[in-house]
Amino acid sequence: MTHWAFSPIQPGAARNMAAWQIAGKKDGPYQIDVSWPLTWSESGDASGKSANAVYLVDGNALFLTATETLRRRESHRPSETGTVVIAIGYPITDSVFSPRRSYDLTPPCDHYIPPEGPDGSPKPEAHGGADEFLTFIAEIVRPFVELKVFPRVSFGRTALFGHSYGGLFALHALFTKPSSFDVYLAASPSIWWNNRSILTEARRFISGAALFSSAHPVLRLSFGSREQYPVRQRVESDEMFKRRQRAAEQRRMNDNCEELYSELLASGRLCKLEVKEYLDEDHGSVIGPALSGGIMFLSNLSA
């Protein structure tokens, strides 16, 4: 009879991953999780290697999915340029989303209209910190990753991925500081937020082409077909479904994405532009395919 031996390993340990907590902000620290190709050394010393980088906001919810997506691809395409994942999140253990995200991921605004809660009443949130958060990523996180963690790696394309408020943040970064990243992956962006004030930024970006002449960014928009047209869930009451329908109709996810795509396409301001609708996916379920599709989109740009 075979005797099997079970030896404990460090809880949650996985190859070629590391994490840091970043202190210095009065509202609380951040956490970054980083992964790199399995063909590199465990220390991340990859002298002479080149790589793309994808930065994720809401990092607690997205880091492992992005890492696994890339590792599956890399196992089949070993000669392809590798990708480093940098997930910016929060040191939390009881959820994958932090309340701090509403401040960090929403643009500053002169007049604020609170979003509605599930009962239809206004639900004010902390908001308007997107500029500060973008500066933190560009001036604190990115230099740490490129100069301290991977000083011998030559980085090529850099991408920013965000979903929902994170998608809104990606659009804000594109429209206000387009040279921050090469590729913007905006999944289910909350264009509806604050009476669609992000569209003012979009039109300023389009009309101010001369101000951003050195930036030739790429944008991929994505959303689920059931975001604007929800399907009733089996355990959902008539009242709950009607509330969800009303909210979906007001937020116009599908129409907003398609209209923004058309406006940007006509402007010719982007090096490449794509919109992708994922059939039978809602706002929550679309995260996986949108993230995977965004990573494939980035990888194919470099293929």
From Swiss-Prot:
Record carries keyword Cell division: no
Keyword Hydrolase: yes
Catalytic activity: enterobactin + 3 H2O = 3 N-(2,3-dihydroxybenzoyl)-L-serine + 2 H(+)
GO molecular function: hydrolase activity, acting on ester bonds
EC annotation from Swiss-Prot or TrEMBL: 3.1.-.-
UniProt-listed InterPro entries: AB_hydrolase_fold, Esterase-like, Siderophore_Hydrolase_D
Coiled-coil segments: none
Keywords, in A-Z order: Hydrolase
Assembly behavior: Homodimer.
Domain notes: Contains a proline-rich insertion between residues 112 and 122 that forms a kinked, partly disordered turn that decreases the diameter of the active site, making it too narrow for the extended, flat TAFC, while the compact, cylindric enterobactin is still able to enter.
Family of the protein in this entry: Belongs to the esterase D family.
Protein role: Displays specific enterobactin (ENB) esterase activity required for intracellular release of iron. Enterobactin is a xenosiderophore that is selectively produced by Gram-negative Enterobacteriaceae. The affinity for enterobactin is quite high, potentially due to the low natural abundance of this xenosiderophore in fungal habitats. Does not hydrolyze triacetylfusarinine C (TAFC).
Protein name: Siderophore enterobactin esterase
Gene name of the record: estA
